[in-house]
């Protein structure tokens, strides 16, 4: 399915077993959106007041996704220069690339990934964030921040290499960090 125009409705349900491509001029808008697809490439806007976007495979976003809930279970989530905003964000992937991107949750940000590349990116939660990263977390010039609770761990495997060169990892509440190695000349509070 390829969208280069406007798809809009009060209640919109899009279920597609293949890949959905929403190009730069594409807009998908709804008061309530239920989007379920095998793969998603978004360069435009996917906007909804409520609802869920679920991808089973790869998600590539260079545009804006703003929904109530985002769930992705693919091999890769590439949000380079993209914006993802939701109440809850649940990312299950082998590789999360958020270079110069923004992923923001107003409630819960959950990331379970082998590698997270957040160089010059922002991973933010107004409430809490849990990052389970097994191999590498690269936060050079990036920001990982919450207002309440932040947990970064490698599922107790003692394999995580965390690079926070000129980056910021902070929480106004509690911070829990467990890694095999930490390279930090940034801010960790």
Task: Pin down the residues of each PLM region.
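Short, T/G/N/S-enriched strand-turn elements that build extracellular solenoid repeat scaffolds
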Residues: 1-8, 20-28, 40-47, 59-66, ...
